[in-house]
Amino acid sequence: MSHLRKNQKEINKADTTFNSSNETCDSGNLVKLTDIDDDFIVELRYATEDNFTGKRVYESAECYIDRETLKMLIEARDVFKKDGYRVKIWDAYRPISAQKRFWEIYPDDNFVARPPDMETMTSFRSTHMNGQCVDITLTDMEGNELKMPTCFDDFREIAAIKNNDPETEEYRNAAYMCKVMEAAGFGASPTEWWHFYDNKNPHPRYLDYRI
């Protein structure tokens, strides 16, 4: 039985009422990943200073994700695991307040989505803010990261899979990850090899549930 089928009931019944500091904030369709599945490696970069801002943006290192998107991620994870790999998550749900901080630090539409109150007709929308997007990489079963085109949050053109030499290990690993994620229903960013968004389910509203 796949992890997706095994965890289906847990995902559907997961409690979305979180801590008292957020009791007035709408948590939407979010679930806490560790309440559902402990087979992912969670390393939220924005809960540390090891990110492009150089500052800790999230108060908590808990990973939240839209419940329907999680079903897709588990489906992809099962394929990766069968092939001998694990999924490491660098980011998932992101509060609106955090997106505002990112825009203040790096206001470039090519790499950072505008916060909702600054969106234009042509700007792209980040589904991190409703929990339907994940930034990931792959590791071996011991947790060692596979070689990829760049580090996380690298804003150079080489972060796009297409800008890499198809003969390299980095390209092959990123292309493989992309293929599996797309088969599970995700869309892939054309500029960031690590960035995948839910391309299957309706997109709910943005949330500002603080983490």
Predicted features by range, described:
Residues A98:
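Short, well-ordered surface patches within globular domains
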